[in-house]
Amino acid sequence: MDIEMIEVILLAIALAMDAFAVSIGLGAKSQKQSSAYVLRLAVYAALYFGIAQGVMPLIGYLLGAVLLGWLATAAPWLGGGILILLGAKMLYEAFNGEIEAVLEDSFDRNMQEKINHRMMFTLAIATSIDAMAAGFTLNLLALNAWLACSIIAIVTAGFGFFGIYLGKSSGTWLEDKAEILGGLVLIAIGIKVMFIR
């Protein structure tokens, strides 16, 4: 496996941590629900989070391709800075319980035996905004954007699916740890983009 593929996989795992943490929270909130409901929730989490996390970096990549020509000399600093800021934001959210607050607000209104697609769509978009910003750096990492976005989507879908079951069985104590891991990986990739060419 070459270094570029390792970077794509690490980026995919880091970007999936928001969706993973939200999925753990959704699973934890579903502990009293039927097995059929939890399976449907896991499938929808995989679909919503996977598609959003795959499309948003592609949008960021396309925007980045346009901006890269204008900002060629500053691009590594800008791209690395974006990843470092995203990582720092994930760490901040992990230590301040912001994901739990979003889930509490959503679930207080929607706890029932049917999937609330509006809530799932909103959570998918909210967790994938960071992925759009990270997509800008795909140009700087010299990665195949289509392959990278496909891997990001598949990894996120897997984390979304299994996060539901992990949350159902273990509760919410893993949410913050997933955010911390994702934040640290994004910071490391950002430093690499800035200083190692």
UniProtKB/Swiss-Prot annotation:
Protein name, UniProt field: Putative manganese efflux pump MntP 1
Family membership noted in the UniProt record: Belongs to the MntP (TC 9.B.29) family.
Annotated membrane topology: Multi-pass membrane protein
Gene name per UniProt: mntP1
A GO MF label: manganese ion transmembrane transporter activity
GO cellular component: plasma membrane
Role: Probably functions as a manganese efflux pump.
Subcellular location(s) per record: Cell inner membrane
Keywords, alphabetical: Cell inner membrane, Cell membrane, Ion transport, Manganese, Membrane, Transmembrane, Transmembrane helix, Transport
TM segment ranges: 8-28, 43-63, 66-86, 123-143, 146-166, 176-196
InterPro entries assigned to the protein according to its UniProt record, in alphabetical order: Mntp/YtaF, Put_MntP
Keyword Transcription attributed: no
HAMAP family on file: MntP_pump (MF_01521)
